């Protein structure tokens, strides 16, 4: 029976009514109030007495009227029965056998249970000469009682109960009461006899077949069971099994294969126990070498170019601390121009970051936290490429002179008026009557050395002449070098100004024309008779345009000189 304090008033009223053999009746008298706040009135009739009470629900009204009835009722109340005492009651609802196993492991003494036969009944003889009333000879059977012997080290305990498990629990309770306050014995080196006794105790719960296999495994001997004979009628079979363990063999007979196998194992086990004991070999202690860390991320430059969120998480993992905690603080701005504020917390450090979306705000918050913790900023890969000067469109060597600080678009070379006039004057001084050379689209992809018919002079002798020609417009040394060939050709009559610039750049030792023309062809830039236009065309369109222009030049050879004068240099 549960504790009466935990019972509800209605339950106690039912017990009171059951004790007096009456039926309690609950009646709903009235229901008032609005729908969200109703009040219910309930009447309780218990015998000739009635009580009324109200509540916000029918159940609460019933409990209130039952509580009122318990306090005002004149009926005698039943005596509460004491709770049943559990013999095996222990804290934690742990069975005594489990608790004893833990204590025995601490003491280093195994707990071994052995069932015992029940005590014999006394020899009782009835008086058969009784002449009186009818003597009933069929007595009710005596309840069966189980007995168990418990051995813990050198201590023995006996338990009894209606079941085998109850007997084990009873013996375990006695052992706990006796051993709980005793000190834990110190482990002492055991001699051969005590070790043998312990082995015998452990082997008491093992079958003979298991013991044979264990001994054979320790001594590295093969084991085989074989049924060599089977005789008798079908309902009374007899089997003979032979067991061979190394050099030992034995036979066993029984009415089943299992029984014959067990008897054969028992016979050969007696022979195996006569063998000398094995030498004790100490097992070597396993030594686990601690692997060194192959990756050391202690460099100050580690993490450059990495995502700040991942970098901060790796830093916390390396510190073996809690991972960063990100919280969205606020969201402000217009619907299409949102601004998110994200906060990150690492230990006692707090940092915030803003961005047009949550991802960027979280990234900025992580970057701010890294700076706050003393780490360098996580620069992006594009910033690193810009710092090192790498560019996918330029594959040649880097120039050794600084770039001019102007706002002119890339790809257009602006000449001063004086230099331009001197270059035009030098073009007019070139002799006419030379053959014109045209470039086919196929020749556009050839190296710059194939565009000139004369042999390219050495850089040491031609570099000063090229520099003088580029700066002053005329150069006697350049004219002397150009007259060495059999048929000197003027620069404008044979090649375009862009090719002249490429030739001069090659003499100076850097590339300027070929790769730059390819780059601006991909971007849609081309040179058209004095005006530079930007198109969104591809490289194929530019090649087609150059091919058509070459065909037009072949059809109108007289316009070449005019085009050469009006053309501008495009890099």
From Swiss-Prot:
> What is known about the tissue distribution of this protein?
Expressed in both somata and dendrites of hippocampal neurons.
Residue ranges, annotated region (Required for dendritic transport): 381-571
The region called Disordered is annotated at 71-94, 178-203, 382-413, 546-571
Phosphoserine: modified positions: 188, 395, 416, 426, 440, 456, 493
- Can you supply one Gene Ontology CC term for this chain's record? dendritic shaft
Which regions span the lipid bilayer? Answer: none
Q: Which GO terms describe its biological process?
A: anterograde dendritic transport of messenger ribonucleoprotein complex; cellular response to oxidative stress; eye morphogenesis; germ cell development; intracellular mRNA localization; positive regulation of dendritic spine morphogenesis; positive regulation of long-term synaptic depression; positive regulation of synapse assembly
Taking every annotated instance into account, which residue ranges of this chain make up the domain DRBM?
Answer: 8-75, 95-181, 207-274, 307-375
UniProt entry tagged with the keyword Phosphoprotein: yes
Locate the motif Nuclear localization signal 2.
Answer: 373-412
Localization per record = Nucleus, Nucleolus; Nucleus; Cytoplasm; Endoplasmic reticulum
Here the segments flagged for biased composition (Polar residues) are: 83-94, 552-562
Record's compositionally biased regions (Basic and acidic residues): 194-203
Alphabetized UniProt keyword annotations: Cytoplasm, Endoplasmic reticulum, Microtubule, Nucleus, Phosphoprotein, Repeat, RNA-binding, Transport
Q: Which GO MF terms does the UniProt record name?
A: double-stranded RNA binding; Hsp70 protein binding; kinesin binding; mitogen-activated protein kinase binding; mRNA binding; ribosome binding
Q: Write down the Pfam families for this protein, in alphabetical order.
A: dsrm (PF00035), Staufen_C (PF16482)
Q: Where is this motif: Nuclear localization signal 1?
A: 273-317
Could you name the domain of life of the organism this protein comes from?
Eukaryota
Q: What does this protein do?
A: RNA-binding protein required for the microtubule-dependent transport of neuronal RNA from the cell body to the dendrite. As protein synthesis occurs within the dendrite, the localization of specific mRNAs to dendrites may be a prerequisite for neurite outgrowth and plasticity at sites distant from the cell body.
Free-text comment on this protein's domains from its UniProt entry: The DRBM 3 domain appears to be the major RNA-binding determinant. This domain also mediates interaction with XPO5 and is required for XPO1/CRM1-independent nuclear export.
Q: How does it assemble?
A: Identified in a mRNP complex, at least composed of DHX9, DDX3X, ELAVL1, HNRNPU, IGF2BP1, ILF3, PABPC1, PCBP2, PTBP2, STAU1, STAU2, SYNCRIP and YBX1. Interacts with the exportin XPO5. This requires RNA and RAN bound to GTP. Interacts with microtubules. Isoform 2 and isoform 3 may also interact with ribosomes, and this association is independent of translation. Interacts with TRIM71 (via NHL repeats) in an RNA-dependent manner.
- What protein name is recorded for this chain? Double-stranded RNA-binding protein Staufen homolog 2
